[in-house]
Amino acid sequence: MIKPPLKSRKKIKKNIIEGVAHIHASFNNTIVTISDRQGNALSWATSGGVGFKGSRKSTPFAAQVAAEHAGRAALEYGVKNLEIRVKGPGPGRDSAVRALNATGFKITSITDVTPVPHNGCRPPKKRRI
């Protein structure tokens, strides 16, 4: 039985002027997603996806490269203005914001959306090194 050919997802050329950059900076990796105002992802990149492995993923330089990669892909959609939302305590927070600024976007606002518990779950035990 012959399988029908898989439909490739072609990039639809949209003209989106305003976007939202979500930067999730954990201690091990940095994920940068650029979406439109409704939350539909336009482009994304991670520190591991752009070629860094192991402990080098958690460096500020890896977050900078990931933000540049996601930013260049979002420029193809016509994104000009960015609202930045940063989540997490990782080392790539500031360098990812600087990289998006250097890519040529006009940054309208920077918001910290790190979730803070109102004394919810018990945190993991402290590390003894």
UniProtKB/Swiss-Prot annotation:
Xref: InterPro entries: Ribosomal_uS11, Ribosomal_uS11_bac-type, Ribosomal_uS11_CS, Ribosomal_uS11_sf
Gene3D superfamilies attached to this UniProt entry: Ribosomal protein S11
Family classification: Belongs to the universal ribosomal protein uS11 family.
GO molecular function: rRNA binding; structural constituent of ribosome
Name of the protein described by the UniProt record: Small ribosomal subunit protein uS11
Matching HAMAP family: Ribosomal_uS11
Entry's Gene Ontology cellular component terms: ribonucleoprotein complex; ribosome
Gene name per UniProt: rpsK
Gene Ontology biological process terms in this record: translation
Keywords: Ribonucleoprotein, Ribosomal protein, RNA-binding, rRNA-binding
